[in-house]
Each structure stands twice: as C-alpha cells, then as structure tokens.
Amino acid sequence: MLKQNPPYREWGLILMKFLASIDVMPIKEILDPQGKAVLLGLKNLDIQGFGDCRIGKHINMEIEAADKATAESIVEDACKKLLANLIMEEYTFELTAI
C-alpha cells in the first residue's frame, strides 16, 4: 500500500500528490506486429490457449496539482501531446491520491 503524504503548500496553494497509471495501446484497426510475434512465439513453445495479443505501454507518473480535476487535465495534456501517438494509439488512465 502506498504511503499517504499530506498536501503541501507552494506559493500559497495547497498541492496534492497523485499517482497516474496510464495505459497506451495500439488502436484495434492497426496491425500489432509485436503482439503477432508474441503469439507466434507462444505457439512455437507449444503454449496453447491464447487468442489475440496486443502489446502496449504502462506508465506510472507522480503528479502534483491543486485538485484531482487539475491533475486529470495535466495527464490528458501529457497523453495527447507526448505519451500517445493518437493516430495509432489510444490511452486510458487512473489517478490515485498519494
């Protein structure tokens, strides 16, 4: 379990800390060569039972913001501008106060 830190002040504002858990995955319409390679490897190792496989990224980041809505806005901005290629990828995230 994560240790909870109390909010702290910066320039008179009380900032809270959040953990953003971000998942970035290729959109379903795009061929995923890494996923296909994993399925082929499993088949070659005679490991049965897997259907589709898609390989993506999982990112954990700490965010400091005045409130949860502001933290969500910061994470959305980071995902749209840097962490995900919106032409080929989609993202989801969860925020947890720490």
Model-derived features: positions:
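Residue-level detector of alpha-helical hydrophobic segments embedded in or interacting with membranes
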Residues: 1-2, 28
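Short, Lys/Arg-enriched N-terminal segments with co-localized hydrophobic residues
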Residues: 3-15
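Long, contiguous binding/interaction regions
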Residues: 12-58, 62-98
